Amino acid sequence: MKSLQDASAESVGKPPPTVLVVADEVLVRMALSDYLRECGYNVVETGDAREAIEVMTSDVAVDVAFSDIVMPGTMDGFGLAQWIRRERPDIKVVLSAGVARSAKAAGELCEDGPALAKPYDHADLERRIRSLLAAAPKRD
């Protein structure tokens, strides 16, 4: 088992993981992004799936995408998750659902179980992200 000191030494010089937060509700997106930054993550915020795809097709190294399922525009969170699985399978996906049925269906598109059901605790999301990153191959 690695000590905290060993783990810190390995991460010296490496950028923190980047989380893409996709949420149309500005205050929710800001609060969640601030919390994740306090936890040590780089955070990129977008308000819809189109903006999220622009980020993921740019030079931004996204590790985890967190998205609401219900969003405005032509693509919802399910569509975004399907796009990520097809075009960017290196990016892990976490979805957030306000309806239990949607949360279960989202489990097929998320690597770590069903979607987080609203209202969720920010700490629950951070644990899910940490778990996904621990299981993922390390990026260079």
Language model: regions and residue ranges:
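Non-catalytic signal-transmission and effector/linker regions of two-component phosphorelay proteins
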Residues: M1-L20, V26-L27, S33, R50-E51, ...
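Two-component signal transduction core modules
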Residues: A65, A115-L116
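Acidic, metal-coordinating helix/loop segments flanking the phosphotransfer/catalytic sites
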Residues: E45-V64, A105
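Active-site residues of response regulator receiver
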Residues: D68-I69
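Acidic catalytic/metal-coordinating carboxylates
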Residues: D48, M75-L80
